[in-house]
Amino acid sequence: MDYTILGLDGSLRPGTREVFEQLVARGHDVYVWSGMGGVRWDEVRRSGLEPFVKGVYRKPLADFRAGLERCGVPVVPDFVIDDYPEIVAHFGGVRIKEYLSRHQEDEEMYAVLAQIDAHQQPAPEGRGPVLTGE
């Protein structure tokens, strides 16, 4: 959550609301997790993201697969968007640069939809979408 969709100044990263809305419109479930402070629904609500978010959880910071259960995360992510490279490497997804404040030029979220679309292109033999995780 921090530095991925929220800056140090509490601002919402540019494009976050639009990208979440598009993801949900395309049939994706969106979950938010935080390694700093646990479950943070209040910030999700304040940012206007609640209509798009299916759940908010603590983020596992190590031993990621087992950490999902420890942190109460009921799903294994297919695609992770995070500034924390280790968790993206483990589950698959895209690492985006840290977002610090509204004064920062930032277009990271706008590139996320294209990366998700590329990730879900049919396999060469037509076996359906290519997904990371289970």
What are these regions (language model features)?
Residues 1-63:
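Alpha-helical substrate-recognition element adjacent to the catalytic core
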Residues 41-134:
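C-terminal cap/substrate-recognition subdomain and adjoining C-terminal extension
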